[in-house]
């Protein structure tokens, strides 16, 4: 009986997530080539966050900061060619993306201070923007 209760609880907790997945995200229309470019950028962002987490786990906070600034921070914008996609993005989506890049630059500075708990908290501000964007928008 206890197992049954746990299964019911898990299903109950999963319902809001499923409801959010089903249609509350705003569709963003992009030409196919730009859509693929944006998806590629987002996959690179995810791989970068993975690399940063590994470096933090190894105690290499300076390196984690360098990677963050180079690949996610404000310094990375030219490499991502994001400016040509901005006109296709809703203003709120642009703001969320820009805030992610600012948060990554702030993380880079925090990581270089060498305080792992503060660096991890700062990194969460980067991923908060990722979560917000993915919860609110869907490329079409």
Language-model segments: residues:
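Hydrophobic h-region of N-terminal signal peptides that target proteins for export
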Residues: 10-18
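Bacterial N-terminal signal peptides that target proteins for export
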Residues: 1-8
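Enrichment for repetitive, rod-forming helical segments
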Residues: 9-10, 52
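Sequence context surrounding c-type heme c attachment/ligation sites in exported
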Residues: 20-140
């Amino acid at each position: 009986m206890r197992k049954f209760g746990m299964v019911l609880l898990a299903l109950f907790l999963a319902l809001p997530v499923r409801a959010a997945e089903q249609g509350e995200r705003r569709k963003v229309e992009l030409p196919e080539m730009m859509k693929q470019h944006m998806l590629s950028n987002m996959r690179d962002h995810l791989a970068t966050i993975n690399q940063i987490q590994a470096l933090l786990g190894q105690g290499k906070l300076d390196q984690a900061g360098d990677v963050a600034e180079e690949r996610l921070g404000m310094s990375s914008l030219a490499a991502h060619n994001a400016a040509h996609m901005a006109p296709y993005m809703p203003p709120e989506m642009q703001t969320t993306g820009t805030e992610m890049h600012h948060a990554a630059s702030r993380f880079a500075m925090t990581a270089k201070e060498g305080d792992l708990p503060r660096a991890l908290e700062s990194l969460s501000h980067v991923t908060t923007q990722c979560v917000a964007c993915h919860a609110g928008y869907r490329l079409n």
